[in-house]
A protein has these predicted regions:
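Conserved internal helical-beta-strand scaffold that buttresses enzyme catalytic cores
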Residues: 1-202, 212-234, 239-244
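Hydrophobic positions on the alpha1 helix immediately C-terminal to the Walker A/P-loop
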Residues: 207
Length: 244
């Protein structure tokens, strides 16, 4: 819904369904051949069984709607640390937010190879009983349906950068962690970066978005957010930890 052009130029209102306002842990699955590989705290279903279930849910779910194709990069495009994906969706809300939260667009296409993450999302009819958020780490596939909530459908975030990336990191020798990254500069110009892990709803974003009090700013202190939720951490050639 377009808002008043004079008061809020270029702004639109997107209304969230009242039954679709949070991530759904009980409907979030890791589907791999061996149940033990999904981890002790995750929901599991055999891939063949889940694919069969999802095919029925997706059948006709985008009929009459526009399908958008979003090529995106988690990290600087062209960086050796970047990971790439494509999300197909029928939601303009997803398109606009993926453009904010990832590096998306034509510039990503030349970097897509056989390792890119394949994602499919459909709002369908927002039926909670058919709402599934599914990761297939052995296939590099993400599928989510019957939701329009960001945590369930912006697949570059929790689905890719945390769940799928945990498996990629295990195989490639790095870590995907539920952590913020904060940059701090003192009055002498020395810069330090901090990563911090808090449970959900305990202040990761608040700390990551920290603005120094006015008195500290006048004395030359600066803070900036590198990331407020997920950190991909590697050991550099210098033996130190580096995070994006």
């Amino acid at each position: 819904e377009k808002l008043n052009e004079e008061k809020l130029p270029g702004c639109y209102l997107h209304r969230t369904a009242v039954n679709d306002v949070a991530r759904v842990e009980d409907r979030t699955f890791i589907c791999c051949e061996r149940k033990e590989d999904a981890g002790p705290t995750n929901n599991w279903m055999a891939p063949a069984e889940m694919y069969a279930k999802l095919r029925k849910l997706y059948a006709g779910s985008m009929r009459g709607r526009t399908m958008y194709v979003i090529p995106y990069s988690m990290g600087v495009v062209g960086s050796p640390f970047a990971k790439y994906g494509i999300e197909l969706t029928d939601s303009i809300y997803v398109v606009l937010n993926m453009a904010i939260m990832t590096r998306a667009g034509q510039k990503v296409v030349p970097y897509l190879d056989e390792q890119f993450i394949k994602g499919l999302h459909a709002r369908a009819n927002l039926d909670p009983e058919g709402r599934d958020i599914v990761q297939f780490p052995e296939d590099n596939v993400i599928m989510s349906i019957n939701s329009g909530y960001g945590g369930n459908v912006l697949q570059g975030k929790k689905c890719f950068a945390l769940r799928i990336a945990t498996c990629l990191g295990r195989d490639e020798g790095w870590m995907a962690e539920h952590m913020l990254i904060l940059g701090i500069q003192n009055p002498q110009g020395e810069i330090r970066y901090v990563t911090a892990a808090f449970p959900s709803a305990c202040g990761k974003t608040n700390l990551a978005m920290l603005i120094p009090p006015e008195g500290y700013q006048k004395n030359g202190w600066k803070c900036w957010c590198v990331g407020d939720d997920i950190a991909c951490i590697r050991v550099g050639e210098d033996g130190r930890l580096w995070a994006v």
